[in-house]
Structures are given as structure tokens and as C-alpha cells.
């Protein structure tokens, strides 16, 4: 549970060389392939676009997000668009790889570039969002969320750029 995490995290170094940097990458060792079989395939960009264009009886958080396409039967979310960057997939992957026990982040199954659009394939995390639950949260709930977010921020602050290999704030 996040609430009982230690707050004295050891600094973790992150280098661009440790990040997967291909335009098209699939993490065959991810839970998607463990759960669906080694020969399972992620939806192609054409399939994602087709699903995004299909009229849906979807309400809530998915109703107004054409750039986030859920594939509920596969427990898969594909985020895509021309303003999306592979760096977002790299960041999610790096945070889960280095801080996964302390920072809740969806598992990334892969990403690809198709023309000027990037597609990031990730775990579909189901449940209520804070936005949806806001009106029903008690002061105790708010305090717990505050503590959890505090520990998450401390964990994120433990990430450091490798000396001589800085990439954040470089441009």
C-alpha cells in the first residue's frame, strides 16, 4: 500500500541509454503477452483508428477522448495522435521499471509510429477516477489521497539523471 511506503528513497540514476528508443517496439515480456499468449498481437494503427471512429455507447471518461481508445476485452488502452511523443511511452516505461512499487503507472506494452502519429499501447486501468469520485470523497479520503500523492512525489524526486548524461532541460 502506498500509504506505508518509506520516505527515504535512495537516489536512482536514469540515463537515456537505458531507455528503449526505437520508433516501433513491443515488450514481449509484458503481462499482455503472458496473459494473451506469446503469439498475441497488439492492434495495428489501422485497427485503432477504426475503433476510434466507431460510434460507441461509452460514457464517463472514455466518451470524450478520441485519442484514448480502450479495448476492454484485451484490458488494453491505446493512446495515439500526432501530438503524442514516444518520450511519453519511454517515461511511463522508465517510471514503472524503476519505481513501479512506489508510483502507480500503467504497464506499457509497446509503441509505434505510423506516419506522423504515435501509438502507445498500455494497460487499461479500470475503476473510478478522482474526477468522477470527487463529490463523494470525505475529508479522510482527501487526507489519504494527499499522503499517497506525497509519497509518489518523493519517489519521483529520487530519480536522478546520470552525471554527464543529462537529457532533461537540455534543449
Regions from the PLM with identified roles:
Residues 1-58:
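Juxta-kinase regulatory segment immediately upstream of eukaryotic protein kinase catalytic domains
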Residues 32, 53-171:
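ATP-binding pocket architecture of kinase catalytic cores
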Amino acid at each position: 500500500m502506498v500509504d506505508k511506503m518509506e520516505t527515504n528513497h535512495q537516489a536512482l540514476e536514469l540515463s537515456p541509454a537505458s531507455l528503449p528508443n526505437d520508433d516501433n517496439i513491443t515488450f514481449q515480456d509484458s503481462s499482455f503477452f503472458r496473459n494473451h499468449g506469446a503469439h498475441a498481437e497488439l492492434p495495428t494503427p489501422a485497427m485503432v483508428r477504426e475503433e476510434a471512429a466507431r460510434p460507441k455507447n461509452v460514457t464517463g471518461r472514455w466518451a470524450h477522448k478520441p485519442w484514448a481508445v480502450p479495448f476492454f476485452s484485451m484490458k488494453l488502452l491505446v493512446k495515439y495522435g500526432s501530438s503524442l511523443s514516444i518520450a511519453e511511452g519511454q517515461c511511463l516505461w522508465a517510471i514503472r521499471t524503476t519505481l513501479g512499487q512506489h508510483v502507480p503507472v500503467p504497464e506499457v506494452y509497446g509503441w509505434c509510429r505510423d506516419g506522423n502519429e504515435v501509438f502507445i499501447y498500455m494497460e487499461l486501468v479500470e475503476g473510478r477516477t478522482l474526477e468522477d469520485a470527487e463529490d463523494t470523497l470525505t475529508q479522510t479520503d482527501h487526507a489519504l489521497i494527499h499522503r499517497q500523492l506525497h509519497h509518489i512525489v518523493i519517489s519521483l524526486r529520487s530519480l536522478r539523471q546520470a552525471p554527464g548524461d543529462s537529457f532533461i532541460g537540455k534543449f
